[in-house]
Amino acid sequence: MKILNESREKQSFKSLSKKLGISSTTSITLFSNSINVSRNPLTEVICIDEFKASTSLGKYAFILGDPLTGNILDILPSRKQEYIYSYFNNIPKEERFQVKYVISDMFESYRTVVRELFINSIHIADRFHWIRCTTESFNKLRINTMNKYLKIAEKSLDNDEARELRLYAKLMKSYYKLLLANKYRKEETYFSTELYIPSLRKHLTRQEIIEFIINSDKDLEEGYILLQSLYKISVYSSYDNFVEDINDWFIEAKNSNINEFKKTITTYKSWIKEIRNSFIIHPKTNKMLTNGYMEGKNNLCKAIKRLGFGYKDFELLRNRIMLIGNKNITIKN
């Protein structure tokens, strides 16, 4: 059917309608009446995530995929625990119990569902999300330090001191991405490359810029060291060594007494098993498993929503994403 073939392309219903010589309303009606995409079976490795759907059934939709094949397995209208629990509980045990790995962010509802319904699986906390806990902690520290400097500068009677504090605050804002850069993922030449700093009227290497900024505040310097220590663990640790490595980091973070890192320590301790599992090497791919592939699928979902200028009808959105996002799907007429 032409409507289904055209709907597989990443285009709006308005564009699709012009090609077929029908109205947008007619094309949507024909599409909705012609398709009902079945869920794909659960596989050995599944990723679970959410994306902003803003349909009549809820703000966030739940997406389920297979990172090994790149297929979207299903999309649900809600990420609420009771909803996804009921959904998975209605899938036969034989199918659920053959799932070996489940990858997700550190959303407590997901952990509850995995523990109770996927009893043969290993739950993996996605690397990006657990690393982000520390980057967010350091970023809060950076912003708090920057605001502290600006407040002191505003009250200072010493013009030179005020000027210097504003300079540091400006550099913290301008070079925040550099401060968050993972030195264990960058080439050495990246940090040794010189940049011209207008505020200082001179050239500095990226490493010199970092040192100039963090040396202005003891907590900021310690926070930066903690951030890089965590990055090092994420790159060089292993399943066998992780517990020892992260416990050393806990001691380092606790001794720093930086408030912005306290919540991160608590989160890591609560999720230590799932975080450790992120270092497991999958036997078939010989790589660690992540939710990275879902980022591409989430971008696809956003693009389809944008092309449709938003979808209030969840089933319309789901069927369109499933049709565009999968190479092979089962369609119920």
Language model feature labels by segment:
Residues 26-101, 106-113:
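RNase H-like nuclease fold core
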Residues 31-32, 57, 77, 94-120, ...:
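Acidic/histidine-rich catalytic cores and adjacent linkers
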Residues 16, 47, 103, 123-125:
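A structural signal for short, well-ordered beta-strand segments and their strand-loop junctions
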